[in-house]
């Protein structure tokens, strides 16, 4: 009976491990694929997520007032979904060029985290200030950082 339980535990453990295995393509490769396909613009949102049983990178690119959303298969690098939306010129603001990079904002958040793991980042306007909204997983809880996209200052944790 003990042998059956051990085998069952090994099987369940390996299934759990395979679903959380790292993506075959890197974050940078996914960003490069989206930017190449978009033919310009700036990444304003990025995250690795599970959709329909497979891992995908969700990438949002703003090009002027056009928002392009891509889902990129994390295993193959293929674009599995694409949506494009024209944002109105009313309240929607076009994204300005930030002075600090996406990678620098991610680094700042991770440095101020307690053994956290990167989950998601979004570049947006908040109260008239261009900020990176960075989400970090710390164990079973998520921690959110608002980082000024021009100074790198953490505005809110």
Where do the PLM segments sit?
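Long, terminal "pre-/pro-" and other extracytoplasmic accessory regions
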Residues: 1-157
């Amino acid at each position: 009976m003990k042998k059956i339980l051990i085998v069952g535990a090994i099987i369940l453990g390996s299934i759990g491990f395979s679903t959380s295995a790292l993506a075959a393509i890197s974050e940078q490769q996914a960003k490069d694929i989206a930017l190449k396909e978009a033919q310009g613009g700036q990444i304003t949102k990025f995250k690795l997520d599970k959709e329909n049983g497979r891992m995908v990178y969700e990438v949002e690119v703003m090009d002027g007032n056009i928002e392009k959303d891509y889902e990129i298969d994390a295993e193959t690098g293929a674009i599995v979904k694409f949506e494009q939306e024209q944002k109105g010129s009313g309240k929607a603001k076009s994204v300005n060029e930030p002075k600090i990079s996406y990678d620098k904002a991610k680094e700042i958040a991770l440095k101020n985290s307690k053994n956290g793991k990167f989950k998601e980042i979004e570049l947006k306007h908040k109260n008239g200030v261009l900020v990176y909204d960075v989400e970090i997983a710390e164990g079973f809880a998520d921690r959110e950082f608002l980082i000024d996209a021009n100074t790198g200052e953490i505005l809110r944790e």
